[in-house]
A protein has these predicted regions:
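Structural motif
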Residues: 110-112, 132
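Aromatic- and glycine-rich peptidoglycan recognition patches
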Residues: 2-5, 21-43, 86, 101, ...
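Bacterial N-terminal signal peptides
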Residues: 7-17
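Catalytic cysteine-centered active-site loop
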Residues: 34-38, 57-109
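Stable alpha-helical elements in mature extracytoplasmic
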Residues: 43-51, 72, 76
Length: 168
């Protein structure tokens, strides 16, 4: 009998610790995303939504604010700063050295995509949206817009991609 009572008390103590740990864990998880996937999704969504708010903003060479206009790297810098608080370098070429290099087959929304538009590599940058589309500030006389990476112009000029968002 004493052995049974000891086992019962031990089991009750263990069950109490498990219930307490589970309750604490569920309270902690209520305030934060439950998985790496959700954290990625939330960060990527923030980047994309911030970028889409700027569709229609005019292009200006060297531009880095919404009111006076944006160039491609100014657009990407502003989006990442406003959505994630991330400070990216000023030029597309410098951005091409940040984050993790990824293959085109591994692209996920929020990744940076790079192109050769000025007869030099990594001279243009945009934000990948998914389904082979990206968001960018294209050129003088144009506005921030969405384009298809499968258009022949972009296919010929594609230089690579970088992942900036952690956990992506």
């Amino acid at each position: 009998m004493p052995k049974f009572l000891c086992s019962l008390l031990l089991a009750a103590g263990f069950a109490s610790a498990v219930v307490t740990a589970s309750a604490t864990e569920s309270v902690r998880k209520a305030d934060e995303p439950h998985s790496l996937f959700e954290r990625y999704t939330n960060a990527a969504q923030d980047v994309i939504l911030q970028g889409l708010k700027l569709v229609g903003v005019r292009y200006r060479l060297g531009g880095n604010d919404e009111s006076s206009g944006l160039d491609c790297s100014g657009f990407v810098r502003l989006v990442f700063k406003d959505s994630l608080g991330a400070q990216l370098p000023r030029t597309a070429a410098e951005m091409s050295e940040v984050g993790q290099r990824i293959d085109v087959s591994q692209l996920k929304p929020g990744d940076l995509v790079f192109f050769n538009t000025m007869r030099r590599t990594f001279s243009h940058v945009g934000i990948y949206l998914g389904d082979n589309h990206f968001l960018h500030a294209p050129r003088t006389g144009a506005e921030v817009r969405v384009e298809n990476m499968e258009d022949s112009y972009w296919i010929k000029r594609y230089n690579g991609a970088r992942r900036i968002i952690d956990g992506n």
